[in-house]
Design a protein with these regions (language model features):
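A composition-driven surface/loop motif
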Residues: 1-196
Length: 196
């Protein structure tokens, strides 16, 4: 395994505004992103097409331009997202294209705040399908949304969602939307052993 640790405090001090997670050929990569409770930099994260491995968020706060995903996963990725401590995505969610897999684990909490006309929390936009979404975490996922139309976990056109554990809270204000599933398409949902 190949491990990297990234400090948000150091990145912000050096005026970086993005983290680009690169794939490593032939090996599973592990990236640790470390923040600090209360520290809120304007930094976004993108994951290169074809990445396979684990990304650990430890007391991380990410934000950027409103309406752009705070974590943008590329095509044909298999990402194990481990949540530790208190984490927040302040201006956008996690984009998972239909060719990728996201598995959420860990005992930390993740809060996603969305404030845009059209929005999604974890999944993909209203005119796209999302990839496979697996939730095996023990911690909480809290999604707060203000907008005209959107989705908490899922996408506009649908996909596969497997929720096996965890605590979930949704506070979604707007004209049209869904907490879990799809807005305009079909979703395959498996939900058990969780608290909503």
């Amino acid at each position: 395994d190949y491990n990297d640790t990234v400090s948000l405090v150091q990145l912000a001090a050096n005026k970086y505004t993005s983290i680009k997670v690169k794939k490593a050929r032939g090996i599973n990569k592990k990236i640790i992103i470390k923040g600090s409770v209360g520290f809120q930099p304007n930094i976004l994260m993108s994951v290169e097409d074809g990445f396979r491995g684990t990304i650990i968020l430890e007391n991380v706060s990410l934000a950027g331009e409103r309406g752009i995903p705070c974590i943008d996963i590329g095509k044909k990725c298999n990402v194990n997202l481990q949540i530790a401590g208190e984490n927040e995505l302040r201006t956008g969610g996690i984009r998972v294209p239909d060719s990728s897999v996201l598995t959420v684990v860990g005992d930390g909490n993740l809060t996603i705040n969305l404030n845009s006309g059209k929005y999604f929390g974890i999944g993909n936009s209203l005119d796209e399908y999302h990839g496979e979404l697996n939730f095996y975490q023990d911690g909480g996922i809290i999604i707060n949304a203000n907008g005209m139309k959107g989705i908490g976990i899922g996408s506009g056109l649908g996909g596969f969602i497997n929720i096996k554990r965890g605590h979930y809270e949704f506070d979604m204000k707007g004209q049209e939307g869904a907490c879990i599933g799809s807005v305009n398409g079909d979703s395959e949902l498996l939900i058990e052993y969780c608290d909503m």
